[in-house]
Amino acid sequence: MPLHPNQDFLNQYFSETWTGDIASYQYSGFKLLEHIRPSDRVIDVGCGDNPFKGKIPNLVGVDPANSKADVMLPIEDYETDEKFDIAFCLGSINFGTHEIIEGQIAKIVSLLTPCGRIFWRCNPGRKDHNNKLCEEIDFYPWTFELLEDYARQFGFKVVDARMDRNSRNERLYCEWQRIFSE
């Protein structure tokens, strides 16, 4: 599975320049805690400064650039025998080509239980981080249609999708639930 060709630049940008504001998102911020049961095992993909740490008992934060992560690796390189009930992909699966995005989704899906769910916050291709370095980032142009197509491709259904705003930007929020075949 290919890594982003500018992974080193992305790691530097997200460890030194970017700052998150998870608390201000209406759906994909701390409101997600309402979807978590105490027994749920959760992986936070691209967890940044690991804001859910201490709020979710069985959480593993994976991030290639932030030292507050439980595991400092790109998701493509993360290996474990553990399976997770829920994956958070909150602004992390936003960079690169269709091939890179598809590979990252395949990896995340492989880490989930048969009843797994994925919560998404996706950037619809906007370079709105309010700094010049952001112009060098290759944002994937997410749409609700792409989220629906990928959900279907990987055996999930979309159970919620809406715009999610904070004081700085507008993002796509989406929840996937695995489809059971009988």
For each feature predicted by the language model, list its residue ranges.
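Short catalytic micro-motifs in class I SAM-dependent methyltransferases
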Residues: 91-95
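Helix-to-beta-strand junctions that scaffold the AdoMet/dcAdoMet cofactor pocket
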Residues: 37, 96-98, 112-114
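Class I (Rossmann-like) S-adenosyl-L-methionine-dependent methyltransferase catalytic domain
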Residues: 1-79, 117-182
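A conserved beta-strand element that flanks and buttresses the S-adenosyl-L-methionine
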Residues: 88
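A short glycine-rich, Lys/Arg-flanked "PGG" loop and its adjoining helix->strand segment in the class I
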Residues: 102-114
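Generic recognition of short, well-ordered alpha-helical segments
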Residues: 99-103, 171
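Active-site charged/polar residues at nucleotide-handling catalytic sites that mediate phosphoryl
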Residues: 82
